[in-house]
């Protein structure tokens, strides 16, 4: 074992035996690891093992088995996310997506920073729908999916309006629409925004303004990309899909 200090974000925890927990933490320095916490009911670690908790951890890393949390400081509990059912649901999906995207025990400080910044912006109140879309698009390469939404797959023209071709796994300009009669028939603004999402530096993102109709179109297209190219269906994603069916009722009850 080795002692290592690292920032970390708790992905989830689960009960283990009578009063112990297994806690999965995405650490900046050591990747995603499973940590064993004994006697959680009496442990000083109880405040930092809940999902969506970030902290500076002192860790005992075991490369062949469970690791251990020695100490922590600088806890960030994402209070606004945890107080808002909708923000919490989307943030939980982002956590699950990060967990699914890379192997355990392999450091990925770039993805860690991207996840942390995404959660920070959701906490600050930026549009969680669009932040989730940006995260989904930029994390595609971690699943081995690399797409160019910037120029036509045939002539590399950057002239809009583009449409997406599943046949060619890329966009077509109007001069090459005929190459795929089964192309999506997308609103060109969807491709424009997806291209922006793919290249935007989230650290520079200050405001988001996308109307509800465009959000629905983006959601449908990104869902199709994940179904066709990634092939995962996370429980947290199923849950936020269900939110769309009855979310308006809850928002009305909450006075939103």
UniProtKB/Swiss-Prot annotation:
Keywords: DNA damage, DNA recombination, DNA repair. The keyword ATP-binding does not apply. GO terms for cellular component: bacterial nucleoid. The keyword Hydrolase does not apply. This is DNA repair protein RecO. InterPro entries: ARFGAP/RecO (IPR037278), DNA_rep/recomb_RecO_N (IPR022572), NA-bd_OB-fold (IPR012340), RecO (IPR003717), RecO_C (IPR042242). GO terms for biological process: DNA recombination; double-strand break repair. Involved in DNA repair and RecF pathway recombination. Pfam families: RecO_C, RecO_N. Belongs to the RecO family.
